[in-house]
A protein has these predicted regions:
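N-terminal, non-cleaved signal-anchor transmembrane helix
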Residues: 1-24, 86, 90, 94, ...
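C-terminal transmembrane helix and the adjacent membrane-cytosol boundary/short C-terminal tail
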Residues: 45-52, 117-144, 152, 159-160, ...
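Cytoplasmic-entry segments and transmembrane alpha-helices of multi-pass inner-membrane transporters
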Residues: 43-79, 128, 232-233
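Membrane-interfacial helix termini and adjacent extracytoplasmic/periplasmic loops
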Residues: 3, 11, 19, 51-60, ...
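Interhelical loop and adjacent transmembrane-helix boundary motif
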Residues: 1-18, 166-223
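Faces of alpha-helical transmembrane segments in polytopic inner-membrane proteins
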Residues: 36-39, 63-75, 93-117, 137-140, ...
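Transmembrane alpha-helix signature in integral membrane proteins
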Residues: 16-49
Length: 234
């Protein structure tokens, strides 16, 4: 019977408890989008817009590029060995949502870092020099000049983190618990159990959520461009 039907969606959400898995994915994606964007921006800002500790900058840049060279499976296994050690004071984070967020941010850190570094490099460094000469606090320049000029890049990074967190499997597959099972992981579990229909339904729901989120980000970007980026068209 190849007739279109919603039976597999209903059965998956109710019988296979895919609703909880999808909700966990949304929590992970939303938290990663906010926390990841903040962390990446702070790291990029400290590298590009501050002075001092020149000896450490090359090391920090290397560490920022390193996640791109580490496979997700290796990253997930590393987190298991580190956080699962009983003597580790951070052991309480194991199999919790904060650890999934941390792992996802680190997994996709490099792309966001490169995007924001490029955006910050495009801003004339004289802004900071003039602010310092006029004794204007750096945070005022940050909030009045730097952040507004970086808004499009910040939205792009946030959208990237959201979609990546919705679809990630490789690293988090080792770190979830029954209470933090994600939608993408549920697809693998259903496929292994032979329930292809429910797995396909879950995949469609994840794709739909990612598509809706992308449209919302585009709308937010259009609105913010009208309100804060009109100077670019002058």
């Amino acid at each position: 019977n190849l007739a279109p039907s919603l039976n597999h969606y209903v059965a998956g959400l109710v019988d296979a408890e895919l609703g909880d898995a999808l909700l966990n994915s949304l929590k992970l994606a939303a938290t990663t989008a906010v926390f990841g964007t903040v962390v990446v921006f702070v790291g990029a800002y400290l590298l590009e817009k501050t002075r001092g500790l020149d000896w450490a900058r090359s090391l920090v840049r290397l560490m920022a590029m390193l996640p791109m060279a580490v496979p997700g499976l290796v990253l997930g296994l590393g987190y298991i060995f580190f956080f699962n050690a009983p003597g580790n004071p951070l052991h309480f984070l194991y199999q919790t949502m904060p650890l999934l967020v941390l792992c996802t941010v680190m997994h996709y850190y490099t792309t966001g870092h490169m995007t924001l570094v490029t955006a910050l490099k495009s801003i004339d460094g004289e802004f900071e020099a003039v602010s310092a000469s006029l004794k204007v606090p750096f945070y005022r320049t940050l909030f009045r000049v730097t952040l507004p000029m970086c808004l499009p890049a910040l939205l792009d990074v946030s959208r990237y983190f959201f979609v990546a967190a919705m679809t990630t499997v490789s690293a988090v597959v080792f770190l979830y618990s029954p209470d933090t099972r994600l939608g993408a992981v549920a697809i693998l579990n259903l496929d292994e159990a032979g329930d292809m229909a429910a797995a396909a339904a879950m995949a469609v729901m994840i794709a739909a959520v990612s598509g809706v989120a992308t449209v919302l980000y585009q709308a937010a970007g259009w609105w913010l461009a009208r309100k804060t980026q009109a100077w670019r068209k002058r």
